[in-house]
Amino acid sequence: MTAPPQFPTPGPGNALIVLGCPEVPVQQALVLHISHQLRNHGFAVHATGNPAVLNLLKVSDPEKRYLPEMSILETCIGEIAEKRRDCGLCIVFAHSDAGISYAATMRHLLPASRLVLIIFGKDPETLAAAADFTCEKIVEKAVHNPMQLRKKINGVFGWVA
């Protein structure tokens, strides 16, 4: 008989990063930056997204120094819905309406968690207006250059760049 999979202990020290499609280049660099900072501040970090974005991250972090745990988004949502996964902090990247929908799903499934929605891309203000649920929003027009968005993220979390 196979032992059931082990999941991190629920609690405020667990962070979940929800990734969108890897179409916009800044996302990958910022995910690695955020994960690095969170791990330095004592968080266990889990990333979730579609296979394409996870494969890009696996290539970028082959030794799993920044992202030791990753899973397919639909699997992660199922684990959360079944109360097998929890987090105190959920960070969602959104550059399309699908990202906003995933953030709304996380808000519904994780009502007690801090939800930070990072909205970026070519037209982030329009997307930000569609996020009509409780969350902290970080909004920046960013496609290729992550520096301004990184500065805003660092400000929200109190990290020194």
Placement of each model-derived feature along the sequence:
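A short acidic, amphipathic alpha-helical/loop segment
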Residues: 30-33, 101-108
